[in-house]
């Protein structure tokens, strides 16, 4: 079994309450804990690349994510990422064609009892093991082509598009 590389970048997935005013900040990643709770036996390695809200990610951050992926021998990569700019990062990675790359995130923090984080991480693990090389986004119970998906903020969900969305 090929080892899956799991990169954490922050986002709502890893947000925690910061103070009594209900302000959130990105905390230490809970991905390893979630994988342990789910009794995942597939070999994987978790690497924290950064701890940022995805609205704070810039081209240099995307270049760093890209360089980590390209430097790794792993052919299967899962990335936990904030949902607001996940599609931007997907487009920035789209020309990496010899690996299976799956981005996922959460609409509420993984530390919350009612969260989609665990489900989305499970979807990402399934997709990364069964998909052809390319870049994908798993959210809302669906595996999307990273070039043919948008986040619909009015629905708080991801939706497929017929045509590729512009590359970065």
PLM regions and their residue ranges:
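Active-site histidine-anchored catalytic micro-motif
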Residues: 1-168
């Amino acid at each position: 079994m090929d080892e899956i590389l799991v990169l954490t970048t922050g986002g709502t997935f890893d947000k925690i309450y910061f103070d009594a005013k209900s302000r959130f900040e990105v905390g230490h990643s809970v991905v390893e804990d979630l994988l342990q709770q789910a009794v995942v036996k597939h070999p994987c390695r978790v690497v924290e690349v950064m701890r940022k809200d995805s609205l704070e990610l810039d081209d240099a951050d995307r270049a760093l994510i890209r360089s980590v992926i390209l430097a790794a021998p792993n052919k299967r990569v899962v990335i936990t990422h904030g949902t607001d700019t996940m599609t931007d990062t997907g487009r920035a990675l789209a020309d990496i064609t010899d690996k299976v790359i799956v981005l996922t995130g959460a609409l509420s923090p993984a530390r919350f009892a009612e969260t989609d984080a665990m489900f989305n991480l499970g979807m990402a693990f399934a997709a990364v093991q069964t998909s052809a090389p390319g870049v994908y986004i798993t959210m809302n119970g669906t595996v999307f082509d990273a070039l043919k998906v948008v986040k619909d903020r009015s629905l708080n969900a991801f939706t497929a598009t017929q045509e590729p969305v512009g590359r970065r």
